[in-house]
Structures are given as C-alpha cells and as structure tokens.
C-alpha cells in the first residue's frame, strides 16, 4: 500500500506512527517558535516555505532584518544545539538564495540565519545570527 502524498517524509520511510509523531512534534515546535519570535517583535513572513533546495521552517522579519529560521526540537538542550549539521546549513543557504531570487524585494534587507531550540520544560532559545555563510 502506497503512503498518502501528504504524509510526512519520516512516515513514508518507516513506521507511520513514529513519522506522524515526529511531524506533530515539529508543528508544535514551530508554533512555539512563532510565539517566541512574535513576542520579540518579529513578523512571520512565511512558514514551511518549500523551495527547490529544501524547506525553510520560518522566515521572519523585524525592521531591516530578514531571518531564515531553523527550528530544532530535541529531548535535551545539548542535542538540540548540535542538531544543525554543516550540510543542513548549506541546504538552508541554498534555500535562502531561492527565496531571494523569487522575492527580489527581500534583497534589500539584511539576511541572517537563526535557530530556535525547543527543549521540554525549558524556555525556547532563540539564537539570532547563528552562523554566517
């Protein structure tokens, strides 16, 4: 039996229950990240933006800053902080290039890459300007 097209990628690879749980965890983590960023004065430009290079979790803006945000949810703080590998950073950089190509009015803004770490029983951590390409 073929998995549904809307099923999360993890569900298509293996156990559907595990994949669905991971998908829901990701949605909850992104919702918490949106709340945190709104409280800090950011405006959400896009959520789960799909580009040929990959998906961007959040695109937010505050003033002249445009941030491509990767949301990481893990069971422990250190695991969340270490979850963004250099390969994923390059993928996000390519996705951001597609974003700027598709929406040229963003090209005048200061682009940066942020990470929001979501860990159970702790406040979410926003790492502004987490890395530079």
Swiss-Prot record:
Family note: Belongs to the UPF0102 family.
Taxonomic source organism: Parvibaculum lavamentivorans (strain DS-1 / DSM 13023 / NCIMB 13966)
Record InterPro entries: Restrct_endonuc-II-like, tRNA_endonuc-like_dom_sf, UPF0102_YraN-like
Pfam families in UniProt: UPF0102 (PF02021)
Protein name per the record: UPF0102 protein Plav_3586
PANTHER family: UPF0102 PROTEIN YRAN
Any one GO MF annotation of this record: nucleic acid binding
Lineage: Bacteria, Pseudomonadati, Pseudomonadota, Alphaproteobacteria, Hyphomicrobiales
